Amino acid sequence: MASIDRFQVMQEPELKILEHWFENEDTRRRMDGMLLLDEWYARVNKDKHDTVIMAYDGQLPAGMVVIEFGEERTYIGLIVNPLYRLKGYGKQILQKLMTEPDFTSVREWVACIEEDNRISLACFQAAGFTLEDTEPDEDGFLTLILRN
């Protein structure tokens, strides 16, 4: 059973974990905007509006969450460890993160997911997100929102 027991701000050595996850073809294809990982990490790490968090099941990394805080909306992205996919970890990560004290003040969470990424769409919907519009944007992304 999926169990997330802690979150921690991602540290540079954990990029090795992400490199391993990016060996998965689906991860690489869907998240190619994060490549090269070291350059991506340097950029988000210095932006005060971005936070990257690792989610752990015991000592095992279950997923990574990227959060971009905006004035009205907070954007969220999720990568689940490829070995943990389709086991409820994504939903568990999202639901547990929303109850963390650092994030309970967020009024509106937004996720932009490719229209053909049915697994991610189902994951975010299972965690309480709803479609903002039934049609994708010009880049083929659907926007899902969760209001607190």
UniProtKB/Swiss-Prot annotation:
GO terms for molecular function: acyltransferase activity, transferring groups other than amino-acyl groups. The keyword Acyltransferase applies. Its EC number is 2.3.1.-. SUPFAM superfamilies: Acyl-CoA N-acyltransferases (Nat). The keyword Hydrolase does not apply. Keywords: Acyltransferase, Transferase. Gene3D superfamilies: 3.40.630.30. It comes from the Bacteria. Residues 8-148 form the N-acetyltransferase domain. Belongs to the acetyltransferase family. This is Uncharacterized N-acetyltransferase YfmK.
